[in-house]
Curated annotation (Swiss-Prot):
Task performed by this protein: Mitochondrial carrier mediating the transport of coenzyme A (CoA) in mitochondria in exchange for intramitochondrial (deoxy)adenine nucleotides and adenosine 3',5'-diphosphate.
Disease: Metabolic crises, recurrent, with variable encephalomyopathic features and neurologic regression: An autosomal recessive disease characterized by muscle weakness, developmental delay, lactic acidosis, and encephalopathy. The severity of the clinical manifestations is highly variable even within affected individuals of the same family, ranging from asymptomatic lactic acidosis to severe developmental regression, epilepsy, intellectual disability, metabolic crisis, and multiorgan involvement.
One BP term from GO: coenzyme A transmembrane transport
GO cellular component, one term: nucleus
Compartment annotation: Mitochondrion inner membrane
Reactions catalysed according to its record: ADP(out) + CoA(in) = ADP(in) + CoA(out); 3'-dephospho-CoA(in) + ADP(out) = 3'-dephospho-CoA(out) + ADP(in); adenosine 3',5'-bisphosphate(in) + ADP(out) = adenosine 3',5'-bisphosphate(out) + ADP(in); AMP(in) + ADP(out) = AMP(out) + ADP(in)
Its membrane topology: Multi-pass membrane protein
Gene source species: Homo sapiens
Protein name as it appears in the record: Mitochondrial coenzyme A transporter SLC25A42
One MF annotation (Gene Ontology) recorded for this entry: coenzyme A transmembrane transporter activity
Length: 318
């Protein structure tokens, strides 16, 4: 009986410790999610703003049958500057920010969560994931972010290829599309987007994480220097965008159909039209050379900013 009396307080003490431990763990998890969201949002905003003029020029070529060349691209940039002013090179960037900030925040925080879940499942808690789960985590993160923010991507594309008179601001785009074309138009081009995001996000995160893992193994340093992170991110962007680029062209055509003279069509029909009218390589890879300039810069800035912000926030929390 005496043992029962002793066991009661002991069990109560153990239960209290378990509840307290669970509460601390839950708060830590919430802080990690908020930290990832904030770091991802800043990373996306900085990266996209840095390459916004090149991004707008790329979209203009993607949605037209005009042949791409570096000379023509810089001519478009120059005439846009002359006719509409310097800040017009960032036209549509406000719509880009409205999309990119939540997109990047969701993508990076989802990637951290998927890494944790897959790492726990495969028994790699606290360590680098093996190759296939690493690729899978990136693909899942990109798909999650694209699914939740797609209408904002369509709005950004519309603003990039139309004159100011057609759409005055982001809300005007939403109102006109909803009224004149129907709400379902806001998800026109969604399937090629997801099909493109899977290899793009999967390969980007996979390449970046793999290069960081190899760096730790061969350099003996736990953390790369910022310029090394930029190089790893640039390589990740180059590989990811090259793999998914044809689907990027298809989604832009589908998103801007109705305002660029092209009829609305399915993925297969859009692909056939591009190949028939412009050729497989010229049509589906139009503007890729510009992406090889802007993509590595944007992805390098994005991954580096996210990592450095995570390190800073962890330091402040500790």
């Amino acid at each position: 009986m005496g043992n029962g009396v002793k066991e009661g307080p002991v069990r109560l003490h153990e239960d209290a410790e378990a509840v307290l431990s669970s509460s601390v763990s839950s708060k830590r998890d919430h802080r990690q999610v908020l930290s990832s969201l904030l770091s991802g949002a800043l990373a996306g905003a900085l990266a996209k703003t840095a390459v916004a003029p090149l991004d707008r020029t790329k979209i203009i070529f993607q949605v037209s049958s005009k042949r791409f060349s570096a000379k023509e691209a810089f001519r478009v940039l120059y005439y846009t500057y002359l006719n509409e002013g310097f800040l017009s090179l960032w036209r549509g960037n406000s719509a880009t920010m409205v999309r990119v900030v939540p997109y990047a925040a969701i993508q990076f925080s989802a990637h951290e969560e998927y890494k944790r879940i897959l790492g726990s499942y495969y028994g790699f808690r606290g360590e680098a994931l093996p190759p296939w789960p690493r690729l899978f985590a990136g693909a899942l993160a990109g798909t999650t972010a694209a699914s939740l923010t797609y209408p904002l991507d369509l709005v950004r594309a519309r603003m990039a290829v139309t004159p100011k008179e057609m759409y005055s601001n982001i809300f005007h785009v939403f109102i006109r599309i909803s009224r004149e074309e129907g709400l379902k138009t806001l998800y026109h081009g969604f399937m090629p987007t997801v099909l493109g995001v899977i290899p793009y996000a999967g390969l980007s995160f996979f390449t970046y994480e793999t290069l960081k893992s190899l760096h730790r193994e061969y350099s003996g340093r736990r953390q790369p220097y910022p310029f090394e992170r930029m190089i790893f991110g640039a390589c990740a962007g180059l590989i990811g965008q090259s793999a998914s680029y044809p689907l990027d062209v298809v989604r832009r055509r589908m998103q801007t159909a109705g305002v660029t003279g092209y009829p609305r069509a399915s993925i297969a029909r859009t692909l056939r039209t591009i190949v028939r009218e412009e050729g497989a390589v010229r049509g589906l890879y139009k503007g890729l050379s510009m992406n090889w300039v802007k993509g590595p810069i944007a992805v390098g800035i994005s991954f580096t900013t996210f990592d450095l912000m995570q390190i800073l926030l962890r330091h402040l929390q500790s």
